[in-house]
Amino acid sequence: MGRITEDLIRRNAEHNDCVIFSLEELSLHQQEIERLEHIDKWCRDLKILYLQNNLIGKIENVSKLKKLEYLNLALNNIEKIENLEGCEGLTKLDLTVNFIGELSSVKTLQGNIHLKELFLMGNPCADFDGYRQFVVATLQQLKWLDGKEIERSERIQALQNLPVVEQRIREQEKAYCLKRAKDKEEAQRKLEEEESKGEMGRSHTGSGGHWHADLSATLPSFEESKDYIQAPEIEEGQCKGKEFDDREDDLEFWNKPSLYTPESRLETLRHMEKQRRDQERLSEKKKKVKPPRMLVTEDGRALNVNEPKLDFTLKDDEKRNQIVLDLAVYRYMDTSLIDVDVQPTYVRVMVKGKPFQLILPAEVKPDSSFAKRSQTTGHLVVCMPKVGEVIIGCQRTSKPVKSTPDSSKEQTSKSQQMERLEVDPSKRSIPDVANIVQEKKHMPRRVCAEPKIIPSEEDPDFEDNPEVPPLI
């Protein structure tokens, strides 16, 4: 049974920021509501109310909606127009396709002086002889009836024939009430028959269940050990048999002819609810429970697990003597949903309850490890120092040598020349014995005579000028 709750109204009040006390428009159609309640207390400022395609059997609890202008109750189980006198601002009322057989109940709308439009098509009263004339004459404030404008001449004729038309309407109402009483009795009888059939079926299945229990008690012990293998097959067969029976019952229900009455609509709703519950029950049985993820074997060996299916990179930083894990965690995920646990031989990261575990290539120090998260990519970086320290010598840095264009040319020319294995005699390391004693003695530089300047014989026109000092 669908009920009007505060949560239901709030979910349909998103256009008003889920505030219900100031709502002016509310739509509760197709919610399987069977009773009107709470709306007049929670939403007193309503102007438009949609309640079509439900199972409402009576108009009630709307008398406090003074500002209500449009009320839609089409496709419901309403049999009488009532309790609308308090809706002072009502201008449009839609009661299409209901079960209104008491046409005289429209007299309760005479106090709604602002009512301009009324829809009663699809109701049993709309088939009465003189239906339109009676409504037009009774509700003189109406401008439209069933989408057709009421003309002045039509109202004058209806008022003239009102006593005769009213008498005919009363006779047809009595005939409809008798027919309706028979329909109710027939529906009650069918309901009792179905309940008795259901009780018989339950008792039959209960006896069958006891028989299976007795049979299982007489089985040998070695069969009991195989019970866990046979049970799923038996259960699957029972589920299939139940599905087949339910399918047959469903076909029988939908193929069975029935009258269009409020009881038949309620019966259809109950049948659909039962189908939905059975389907949910079967789906729960078929649903396989996942076994818990094994992270460590029985012998204490850790396993590699990546249940969240995240990309990762594991680097061995020899320079800093540590292992770095870069885990591609979702960028906009809250850090509180991540839990890191570093062990000497493996690292475990819980991402939203899903484990990521990786075995490390070397033993690390859990106390010295740390984790940080990138603010740009959201990746999680875990740095884990190794246990064994490695001493690495510092490498001398070579000074940069400036290169000149001449040196580069010399290097290219040297590379182009052919290198031979002959040794230059001037670069020998063996001393020259012949030149140990010098024959000529070197005179001091001051004692040495100045060289004479001899004019060049090659130039015949040379004339020596004594005034010019020698160029030494």
Swiss-Prot record:
It comes from the Eukaryota. Keywords: Cell projection, Cilium, Coiled coil, Cytoplasm, Flagellum, Leucine-rich repeat, Repeat. Its main location: cytoplasm. Residues 456-466 have a biased composition (Acidic residues). GO terms for biological process: axonemal dynein complex assembly; cerebrospinal fluid circulation; epithelial cilium movement involved in determination of left/right asymmetry; epithelial cilium movement involved in extracellular fluid movement; establishment of localization in cell; flagellated sperm motility; inner dynein arm assembly; male gonad development. GO terms for cellular component: apical cytoplasm; cytoplasm; cytosol; dynein axonemal particle; extracellular region; motile cilium. Residues 187-202, 265-283, 407-430 have a biased composition (Basic and acidic residues). Residues 187-210, 265-291, 398-472 are annotated as: Disordered. Residues 305-406 form the CS domain. Residues 177-202 form a coiled coil. Gene3D superfamilies: Ribonuclease Inhibitor. The keyword Lipid metabolism does not apply. SUPFAM superfamilies: L domain-like (SSF52058). PANTHER family: CILIA- AND FLAGELLA-ASSOCIATED PROTEIN 410-RELATED (PTHR18849:SF0), LEUCINE RICH REPEAT PROTEIN (PTHR18849). This is Dynein axonemal assembly factor 11. It comes from Bos taurus.
